[in-house]
Amino acid sequence: MIQMQSTLDVACNSGARRVQCIKVLGGSHRRYAGIGDIIKVSVKEAIPRGKAKKGDVYSAVVVRTKKGVRRPDGSVIRFDRNAAVLLNANNAPIGTRIFGPVTRELRNEQFMKIVSLAPEVL
């Protein structure tokens, strides 16, 4: 469950390390975002020669949450940290690598590029 002011790790090699959610997209008063949802983020911490610079605003898709995601069989997949992948204007990932596991739910949300780049799909 990501809301405004939540900080997330970045799970791609776009150059950003930490981002802060500044808006949850998808409805005028939508409060929370879960795995597979798109949010607007501001880069709070970045590596020196990366594509993303501190202060830049990007769209991002949430790939891991502490709240987790519930499957139809009743199981819940949770993670230790919240993480997102930065997207460009066409909703394609900016980075060329994805770090850490992602969930199968991203496949339903048309983020096949992220699923194919991820080292592990849960």
Curated annotation (Swiss-Prot):
Q: Which GO terms describe its molecular function?
A: large ribosomal subunit rRNA binding; structural constituent of ribosome
Gene Ontology cellular component list: cytosolic large ribosomal subunit
Source organism superkingdom: Bacteria
SUPFAM superfamilies hit by this protein: Ribosomal protein L14
Q: Name one Pfam family in it.
A: Ribosomal_L14
**Which InterPro entries does this chain map to?**
Ribosomal_uL14 (IPR000218), Ribosomal_uL14_bac-type (IPR005745), Ribosomal_uL14_CS (IPR019972), Ribosomal_uL14_sf (IPR036853)
Gene Ontology biological process terms in this record: translation
Asked if the record carries the keyword rRNA-binding, the reply is yes
Keywords for the protein's UniProt record, in alphabetical order: Ribonucleoprotein, Ribosomal protein, RNA-binding, rRNA-binding
General function of this protein? Binds to 23S rRNA. Forms part of two intersubunit bridges in the 70S ribosome.
Which PANTHER family does the protein's record reference? Answer: 50S/60S RIBOSOMAL PROTEIN L14/L23, LARGE RIBOSOMAL SUBUNIT PROTEIN UL14M
Q: Fill in the subunit field for this protein.
A: Part of the 50S ribosomal subunit. Forms a cluster with proteins L3 and L19. In the 70S ribosome, L14 and L19 interact and together make contacts with the 16S rRNA in bridges B5 and B8.
Family stated for the protein in its record: Belongs to the universal ribosomal protein uL14 family.
Name it. Answer: Large ribosomal subunit protein uL14
Natural source organism: Shewanella sediminis (strain HAW-EB3)
State the organism's lineage: Bacteria, Pseudomonadati, Pseudomonadota, Gammaproteobacteria, Alteromonadales
